[in-house]
Amino acid sequence: MEIWMFTAPFKQGILKELAKCWRDYDGKKYCMGIEKGRGGFRHIQGRIKVSADTNYEIIERIGKRKTRTRKGYRMFDTLSKAGIHCQKTDQWTDYESKDGYYIMSDDTEEVRAQRFGHPTEEQEDVLRLLESNNDREITVWYDETGNVGKSWLTGHLWEKHKAHQVRLTGSAEGIVKDVCSKMDQERRPIVIIDIPRSGKWTPAIYEAIEVIKDGLIDDPRYSAHAMNIRGTKVMVMCNTKPKLDRLSKDRWIFYNAPVGADKG
């Protein structure tokens, strides 16, 4: 197996065109995204994993050349003539997905629909409220009935590399460890705590919210590696009411405030 990095000029429909090429010629795995370089130049950056003996066929298809050469021979030069520059690498990452406009070989139709879909007006309202939060506030999207798009929005923001979803554990330390581990892999501006209908607010959630918003977090599993994430937006999605006295009054900003709480 070989891994290749490639850069291609942007044109309408290029992602689908390249994806079809990778499928037709047995590309084992790929990730490619649209990026904007210096001066606003838009281009495609990607990686593909292929069997060594299929290299020439991929070159011929993308490079639109009819003259055969030995398999894999002068790959860089051939692709360059088609405006596609290629370089062999030993490393596979999904780095090309970082800007949120990308496709991968293991995508399903449902995943792509969520990634490229557009939030509803209500979801946009929630995001505007979240964006207005200061370094102490959290946004709580409370909805007693459900089915208003909270989980869809969580997935959308995750796919666009804008949010991490917290894995709820039985302790505040476990929640903070999870956030620290994910932020260490990739800094994202939003942390989402999605409390399922069968779940409930716990002391661990209140405590973790305060620690995350205060900014300094660490994961003792990795020699107390600490990082400062102050300014990260925190949104809690829930179907049950929180106990408002568990956090300072100035922390709470509600979308669809429950009875007894002031709406942000």
Positions of PLM-derived features:
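Structural motif
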Residues: V140, I190-D194, V236
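Walker A (P-loop) phosphate-binding loop of P-loop NTPases
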Residues: E144-V148
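Short glycine-/polar-rich loops that comprise or flank the Walker A/P-loop
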Residues: E2, G27-K28, R42, A82, ...
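AAA+/P-loop NTPase substrate/partner-engagement loops
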Residues: K160-A204
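Catalytic "initiation/cleavage/transfer" segments centered on a nucleophilic residue
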Residues: M1-D26, S51-Y142, K162-L168, D262-K263
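Hydrophobic positions on the alpha1 helix immediately C-terminal to the Walker A/P-loop
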Residues: W152-L153
